[in-house]
């Protein structure tokens, strides 16, 4: 009742059961720009308690890969056994890798002017933003979440894991 009353007062016709999202024009994704499709590996699920241990990305323009970025991250953490089992990454693999500050500085430069794309982007971006903030690095890139898109567009899938979606 409140929504109908507000709609009538505003002179608009409500369409009940429909969600609408408004974006400022400045937030619309430019289809001509480059895209950075990326994935992180971490030591756990919470950016405040866990570390980034690998960043992998490809930059695309006009549907073609134009650059690549891949590095392990070594801040002296020991990789928990369950993370090694999940990712295949061992503590020894991090030896000689750059630290988080260096990796995120380089990744920031790599992503400059690009839209970011990730499967479960909220997870990856929470780690990127949290750890970048420790070094006064800010990521303002727009990003697209392929997990959200698959849930919205592919209703018949048994799940929306990346392997299933691909």
Stretches with model-predicted labels:
Residues 1-38, 59, 110, 115, ...:
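Phosphodiester-processing cores and adjacent nucleic acid-binding clamps
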Residues 8, 47-48, 100-103:
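Transmitter module of two-component histidine kinases
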Residues 40-48:
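Short acidic, Gly/Ser-rich segments with clustered Asp/Glu that frequently serve as metal-coordination loops
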Residues 51-53:
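Short coil-to-beta strand junction motifs in C2/discoidin
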Residues 60-64:
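Short acidic-glycine loop/turn motifs at beta-strand connectors
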Residues 66-68:
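A structural motif specific to WD40 beta-propellers
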Residues 95-112:
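Catalytic-core regions of hydrolytic enzymes
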């Amino acid at each position: 009742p409140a929504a109908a009353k507000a709609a009538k007062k505003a002179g608009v016709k409500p369409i009940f059961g429909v969600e609408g999202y408004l974006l400022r024009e400045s937030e619309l994704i430019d289809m001509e720009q480059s895209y950075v499709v990326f994935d992180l590996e971490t030591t756990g699920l919470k950016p405040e308690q866990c570390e980034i241990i690998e960043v992998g990305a490809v930059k695309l323009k006009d549907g073609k890969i134009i650059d690549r970025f891949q590095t392990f991250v070594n801040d002296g953490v020991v990789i928990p056994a369950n993370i090694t089992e999940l990712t295949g990454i061992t503590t020894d693999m991090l030896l000689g890798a750059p630290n988080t500050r260096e990796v995120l500085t380089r990744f920031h430069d790599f992503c400059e002017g690009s839209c970011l794309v990730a499967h479960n982007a909220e997870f990856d971006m929470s780690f990127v933003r949290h750890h970048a903030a420790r070094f006064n690095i800010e990521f303002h890139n727009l990003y697209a979440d392929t997990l959200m898109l698959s849930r919205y567009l592919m209703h018949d899938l048994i799940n929306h894991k990346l392997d299933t979606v691909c």
